[in-house]
Amino acid sequence: MFYSIIRLSIYKPLITISFVLLISLFCSWKLFQTSLDIFPEFSPKLVVIQTESQGLSAEQVENNVTRPLESYLAAIPNMDYLRSESIAGLSVITLTFKENSDHNINRQLVLEKLNGVKNILPSNANTPLMMPLASSAATIMTIGFTSEEKNLLDLRTFVDQHISPALLSLNGVADVNVFGGYERQLSIILDKDKLLKYFISLESIIDHIKASNLIVSGSIQTPNQELQIVSNNVIPIEKIREINLLNDNGQYFKLKDIATIKFTAVKQISKASIEATDGIVLMIIGQLNADTVAITKSIDQSLSKLKALIRSNKIELHDQIFRPANYILKSLESILDHLVLGGCLVLIVLIIFMFNLKAALISALSIPISLLLASILTLSTGTSLNIMVIAGLAIALGEVVDDAIIDVENILRRLRENAKLKNPLNTLRVIYKASLEVRGSVIYASLIVMLVFVPLLLLSGLVGRMFAPLGIAYILAIFSSLISALTLTPALSSISFRKYTETKEPFVINLISPLYKKILSYITSFPKLYSIIALLLCSSGIILAPKLNFGFLPDLREGHFMIHTSSITGTSLSETMRIGDNISSKVLQIEGVKTISQWAGRAERGADTFGSHYSEFEVELYDLTGEKEQIVHDKIREVLINTPGISFELNSFLVERVDETSSGFTSPIVIQIFGNSLVNIDIASNKLHQGLLESNLLRDVQLKSVLDKPQINIEFNNKLLAKNNISLNQAKLFINTAIDGFIIDNYYEDVLLIPVVLLYKDENHIESIDYIKNLVLFNKLGQPIKLKDISEISITKG
């Protein structure tokens, strides 16, 4: 077969060249259409389930939500393992499936399980939600909004009404996590004095409000048509005020007679700032296998359409907070520049040694042809065009030209020998024989080189997912160069050297040949000695290898840093933001820092599930050299070290994402302690934490989960409840209503889902344990009873 291919290429060169040209054009066209990404999809097959549980502590969430869900989901087919996290108000369960499983089938199996799970959860828990299928890098772009004229409630409403829906409608966007601002709720704030006057229970008020929002349905049949019965279930605020209530005495009155009805802010679970100014931060999450560069362009186009609306509302858009696409394009440009430079160097060396421009060009032409074909073949395996693929092609740069050089050099040598003959043979016949002479060695050499990279394809887990595309790209580049050497090189040689009559060796070869012959003769005179020297050199390399510093990835210079800070557990959002604003102000003064943003807490449906003590910063840099980036890194680190009361991590985005994929955390080394007693786990973790802090080999040591978060514990006394004519359910409903409010219903206003919340509190109160103790509820006889008279209230740690 090889003989026929080479013969066709030499005797019908135009057919071969035309065919190669068509393939090259197709590959180029296909390459421009392919998706661009940073890394290959390196995360395992994950399904993440989040369950919001308003008002529940971390321990209550763990016992009443997380553990029941874990038991319910434990027997799903193809699941490798399950991990969970419980924080105040939120349960997160991450299911990891086998690598050979299918994403869609995995999600379908989990969804089927979730359909019947609501009955086993407490009433405080919302329906468990399966998070969108996101890419490994997750974040496509981070943007922010600030305003000097709008308050944070109006700013958040604007973002939720106009920005988030526009972004979510874009192809490739999986989710938008919104941090900061205040969401709206319709609050029904009860007046305790008027409650006593009209003598109506909370249960009765809730029932009346729910009934007013019932959907009326049905239809009637007339002789010639069917008429649907409808009633607008979305009641405007004016009509809510007019809802009729009926107490046990048969007295009718309006809701506005006992309550103030108005729009207020939902209790915050996150805050955000841009350059130390309060605002809204949006983290845009990409879908699995998303084209980061293309989606970034779509986002920019979408935002440009909204800029007039944004400006008219006196809002400032910050769209340069974090853009991974910049790093992708910069990396691709850098690698392509190096490929071009490498190709030029190869061409120069070939011209010097071959002393024949045509021969050098034929050999060098195999580089772009081989890399183009290898790129398309690699993409056909299902991977995207990413840094690892291009790195594989770059490594193969020096190899892909070898086959062509061997072929062309042997052709020229045989043609020179033929030219010296009295009766020279046909040049095409000489070219054909010369190509066949080296064909076996070229094929065997290519196969051996390809086999060296096969182990990369056999790696499993994160390492396999990360480096397999590099190995595939390299192997296919060598294979493509072999194809080029069998077809294009003989075809071009037959056209270029058809009338070749040169008999002299190239000048450089003539110059160095005598010296090389002397060295070779000397070495071959002492074969044992030089074999021992070679063996010693190899052995020393093996001995020194363990002493080298090893790392999974190099320190990437992305032009962007991620800062994670953690204060004492229980620190409020306001205090966390105060500390963060101080850090932001100092970091902005560092030369080379372009912008900085911060968010604290968590977003609904967000991947990061942390409490109010946790904060994350995005630091975007100007275009700097690697050395200057390191200087900025060190200065930021110095700012963080000198900030009291926090522990911190300072990473680049990609390294952090790889660490988070491998361990579930943003650190390269994670130690988890298991046990049956939270107290004992806390003691052991604190001892280990102190020991690790003393090590000189470690830095940024953090204790993520601690037990001593302060909380208010309310223990109801059944005897006192009975004595005061109050049921336990009534007391618990009162607590929910008085502290965070009781969500009665939801309704849509435009695209916003507005919760209707019943509140029983003094709007001007100062939240403290004394306020909790002195909360007044009314028993069935209308008598006022303080909460401290029916329960034990104390501050505990949990």
What are these regions (language model features)?
Residues 1-113, 268-623, 627, 631, ...:
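Hydrophobic regular secondary-structure detector
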